[in-house]
């Protein structure tokens, strides 16, 4: 590395985000830009570690969830190039493994940093921020340009779904010379990138559409408002193309089939987030074609990234109160002995939505080890409250952990909107059934 002692000379540093109380008044991205000189210092912190676990992207020991970058980004190489001020070379190395670093650099949870060797004894290298800085600098300098293939293979490929998997698949196949058509059932290209992740986390016009326009200029064709399996049969695409690739994602949400589930005001998180972003892009919310949390008591069930996005969105609407339920225990402040480096550190943190809620209402909105028992509606059929109980995890007769209610911990929560953000069960069935594809 160009600065062998950099990790001892420079402390970890990130650009300061816009104030939570200011940023909840708009839908703009809230991460500020770090000066180039400070970015070079951060790149210098990447030590000559010998075995860079940051880009391992594999399981280290049986039973763990893996460590390092799942797409094997060449992290030490472009960190060193940033330190040297060789930004264009850093961009070239970044693009060797990552089609869309402007997406991952904004929304990836950065398992690379959890596996950084510097992080064993000190705060890890700011890999994620360096990554997004490289690609944004590349766009600013005009280095990221359309690169249509010099020759066409004569083969055609249909890609179903224009989310990150579909776009990456299309980019790779198009680069190999094949003619690619991407089918998207929504009115805009991007899938989860467009309608699943809120604008303040990933700007749609400046970031997502910028890349989509570049892909179009490279020769990829996009057909929106076209649901394969309904508007066009999957078999038709098989017959009309040399290959068909399914990139529809896991869009089937986990439900909560308890008493009162049919009451109005209980929504899947993606319905809430999708409608919000579509209305924002269509009319700046002037059309009111979204589920508004303004003045409402909002409860989010689920503690993952989607739940966090629901919190941030509800706050920007101007919700009256906000609570978030997590059935798992509160993570420890530091790694547990059962969660050693280089595994992803399961530790307590405030993500952006919880940070904003704490600034707005004074407390982290999350409650841990809590389970919803039933929903209760008013005389007009709208949700007005939900009932919960605290739980502890205990093993059943088969040795599996199951939630056990704690007697006397029952509580009633006022609720005008309930958002279910409990993960996803897999892909939808229509197209898979048509093509007789087996599922795990």
Describe each PLM feature range.
Residues 108-122, 241-247:
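Hydrophobic or amphipathic alpha-helical targeting/insertion segments
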Residues 1-37, 41, 131-440:
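Residues forming the flavin
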């Amino acid at each position: 590395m160009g600065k062998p002692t950099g990790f001892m000379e420079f402390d970890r540093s990130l650009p300061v985000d816009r104030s939570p109380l200011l940023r909840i008044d708009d839908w703009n991205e809230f991460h500020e830009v770090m000066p180039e000189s400070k970015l070079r210092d951060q790149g210098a912190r990447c030590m000559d570690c010998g075995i860079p676990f940051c880009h391992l992207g594999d399981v280290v020991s049986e039973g763990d969830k893996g460590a390092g970058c799942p797409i094997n980004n060449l992290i030490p190489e472009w960190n060193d190039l940033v330190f040297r001020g060789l930004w264009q070379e850093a961009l070239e190395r970044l693009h060797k493994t990552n089609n869309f670093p402007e997406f991952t650099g904004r929304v990836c949870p950065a398992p690379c940093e959890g596996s950084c060797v510097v992080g064993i004894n000190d705060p890890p290298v700011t890999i994620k921020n360096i990554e997004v800085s490289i690609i944004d600098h590349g766009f600013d300098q005009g280095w990221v340009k359309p690169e249509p293939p010099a020759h066409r293979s004569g083969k055609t490929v249909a890609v179903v779904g224009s989310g990150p998997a579909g776009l990456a698949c299309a980019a790779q196949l198009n680069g190999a010379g094949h003619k690619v058509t991407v089918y998207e059932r929504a009115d805009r290209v991007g899938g989860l990138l467009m309608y699943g992740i809120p604008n303040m986390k990933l700007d749609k016009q400046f970031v997502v559409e910028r890349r989509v326009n570049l892909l179009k200029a490279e020769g990829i064709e996009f057909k929106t408002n076209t649901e394969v399996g309904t508007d066009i049969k999957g078999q038709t695409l098989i017959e009309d193309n040399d290959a068909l690739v399914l990139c529809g994602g896991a869009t089937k949400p986990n439900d909560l089939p308890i008493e009162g589930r049919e009451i109005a005001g209980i929504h899947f998180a993606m319905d809430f987030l999708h409608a919000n972003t579509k209305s924002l892009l269509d009319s700046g919310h002037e059309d009111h074609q979204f589920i508004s949390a303004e003045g409402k008591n909002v409860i989010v069930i689920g503690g993952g990234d989607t739940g966090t996005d629901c919190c941030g969105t509800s706050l920007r609407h101007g919700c009256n109160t906000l609570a978030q339920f997590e059935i798992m225990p509160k993570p420890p402040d530091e790694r547990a002995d059962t969660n050693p480096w280089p595994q992803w550190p399961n530790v307590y943190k405030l993500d952006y939505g919880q940070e904003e809620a704490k600034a707005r209402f004074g407390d982290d909105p999350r409650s841990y080890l809590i389970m919803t028992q039933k929903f209760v509606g008013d005389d007009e059929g709208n949700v007005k409250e939900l009932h919960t109980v605290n739980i502890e995890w205990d093993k059943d007769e088969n040795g599996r952990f199951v939630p056990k209610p704690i007697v006397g911990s029952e509580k009633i929560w006022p609720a005008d909107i309930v958002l279910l953000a409990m993960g996803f069960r897999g892909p939808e069935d229509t197209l898979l059934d048509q093509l007789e594809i087996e599922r795990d």
